[in-house]
Amino acid sequence: MKIILVGCGKVGTALARQLSEEGHNVTVIDTNKARVEHISESYDVMGITGNGSSIITLSEAGIEEADVFIAVTGSDELNLLCCMFAKKAGHCHAIARVRNPSYSHELDFIKKQIGISAIINPEMAAAREISHLLRFPGASKIDTFAEGRVRLIKFTLTEAQALDGVAIREIPTRLKSDILVCAVERDGGVIIPNGNFVLRTGDQVTFLATQEKAHEFFQRIHLAVRPVRNALIVGGGAIAFYLSQELLENHVRVRIVERDPARCDVLAQALPDAQILCEDGSNREFLLSEGLTSTEAFVALTNIDEENVLLTLFAKKHSNGKLVTKINRLEFDDILAGLDLGSIVYPKYMTCDYIVQYVRALQNEAGSNIKTLYRILDDRVEALEFTVHEKSRATGVPLSQLHLKKNLLLCCITRGNEIKIPRGGDEIQVGDNVIVVTLEHGLHDLRDIVED
C-alpha cells in the first residue's frame, strides 16, 4: 500500500520503520530537514521536507495515489488540517493523532465533519490501560480483546505462587483454573510454550482468560485482585487528567502532585473531587509526608522519563503499593526491563500499534480483518484478534489437524456470547473472532497462521 506519513518525531519514526518493514511504499513529510534525512537514510522510505498541510507538498508526495494518510505531528490542529486537505486532494483513509483533552468529547463529530477514518488519542489509551492495572494490581500488563471480555495478562512468578516446577498442562486440574499460558519470558528469551513446558520461579508469564477466570486464578496463586482504593499521581498532564476521571468514577481517592501552579488551577477546576498538591514531585520529603508509604498505588506521569524512573525507584523503596511508570522514549525499553519499575506504560507504542493494526486490516477486508493488535513482551511477540469473514484453509478443520506455524498459539475463539479456550476438536467458523499469539511479525490474515 502507498502510505504518506506526516510528522517525523518518535512516533513517526517508529511507524516509518514498522510500515516499511511490512513492505509498504512509505513517504514521510516533515518541516525538519534533518529528521527527514535521518528517516529516509535509516529505512526504505521516501522523504520530503515541507508542510504536510500544503497541497503542493501533498501532491509531490503523491496524495492522489495514496491508500493511507497518517498525521502524527506535535500539533493536534495541524494533524486535523493535514487530514482534511488529504481527504480533499485524494481518496485515502486518513488517520490523525489528537491528544488535547479539550477535544475528547468531540472526536466523533470531528471524524464525521472532516471525513477522517480514525483518530487516536494515546494519552486516553494510556490512562485506560493504567486504570485496568489499578483495578487488577497483581498484573504487570493487561491487554484486552473481544470488547474487553477477554484479557491477556502478564505477571511475575514468585515462590509464593507455588507454581515452580509445574507443567502448564497441570494448571487446569491442579488449580481448577480455566486459563491458557500463552508466552513465558525466561533468561532474556521468549517462549511460546506447549503443555509440557515447566514453569520456574522468576518467569514472566503471560496468560489469556476472561476477567472472572483471571480473578479466580490470581486468588488461587495468592496475587492481589482487590482494586486499589487510593492513588498518588506525580505529574498533572493529559494522562493524569484522563486517569483521574476514570478512578474518581470508580470511587478511588486521587491525589495529584503537579509543580506548575497554572496547571494546578486547571486540574482543580476540572477535577473537583481530586486533591491537587502544588509541589515539586521530586521532593522526597514531601512525598513521604503525603503518605507515600501507605498509598495503594503510585503512578509516575511526568514528562521526563528519567524523573519517572527515579520516582518509581524511590516509591518502590518506601511503598508496597502498585507501581506504574510512564515512559515516552522507545529506545531504552530493554534497559528499563531490568529495573523492576512495576508496570511500564508506553503511550507512543499504543499509537504505533493502533495504526499498524488499522493498516493491516485494510489489506484484508475480504478474508479476515485484524480487529485488535498488540505488540507485547518488548515488541518480540504479537497478539492479534481476527474476525473471520469467509471460509479458508483455516476454517472448518479440527484444530488438531491444522498445521499451525511454529512459535504460534491459537488462544481463544469467541462465537457470539461464547468464549472458548480451544481444544484439538474445535473448529474455526465464519463469524468467529480468533485470538492468536505468535513470535512471527507481520501476520495479515487468519490464513497466515497455517503452514504453506
Residue ranges, per PLM feature:
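Cytosolic regulatory regions of ion transport systems
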Residues: 1-452
